[in-house]
């Protein structure tokens, strides 16, 4: 108990270190008292750890293990900091700790929630309601559109 386990939510069988795992892994380990870390080694997956944690939480619920939202959020915030031995400095919102903060318009574990504001190193860098603080998509690169020089 108390040992941190870095697991995927449900990406199993796609390579050797994920060969024989199960989607209920995070919930079963949490239920046994382990420190769970939902992780990804993919540049896209790392951007959606909140959704990955929600999938693992739902897999636990399906087998009768109810993981509170606060615990599931800790799987990608506080627990990685614990595993690296830096939880006294980061990983949770507490006075004196370093943090980048995302303010969501709903439950951060919901696929329907979107970030409203993002602070990095104390500076507001993204604000969904402020056009100057929203990134411009390069999806239509080279085509006339928002953000292009006219």
Language-model region placement:
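His/Asp/Glu-enriched, well-ordered alpha-helical/loop segment
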Residues: 2-104, 124
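A generic membrane alpha-helix/interface feature
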Residues: 20, 51, 118, 139-141
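Short alpha-helix boundary/capping motifs
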Residues: 57-58, 108-109, 143-147
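C-terminal cap of metal-dependent C-N hydrolases
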Residues: 82, 94-138
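Gram-negative outer-membrane assembly/targeting C-terminal domains
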Residues: 130, 139-150
């Amino acid at each position: 108990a108390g040992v941190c386990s870095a697991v995927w939510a449900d990406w199993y069988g796609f390579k050797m270190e994920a060969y024989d795992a199960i989607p209920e892994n995070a919930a079963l380990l949490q239920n046994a008292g382990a420190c769970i870390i939902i992780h990804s080694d993919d540049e896209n997956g790392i951007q959606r750890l909140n959704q990955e944690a929600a999938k693992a939480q739902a897999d636990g619920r399906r087998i009768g293990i109810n993981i509170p939202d606060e615990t599931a959020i800790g799987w990608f915030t506080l627990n990685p900091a614990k595993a690296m031995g830096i939880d006294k400095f980061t990983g949770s919102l507490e006075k004196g700790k370093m943090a980048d903060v995302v303010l969501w318009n709903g439950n951060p574990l919901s696929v329907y929630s979107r970030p409203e504001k993002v602070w990095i190193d104390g500076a507001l860098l993204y604000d969904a309601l402020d056009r100057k603080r929203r990134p411009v998509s390069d999806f239509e690169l080279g085509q006339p559109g928002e953000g292009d020089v006219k």
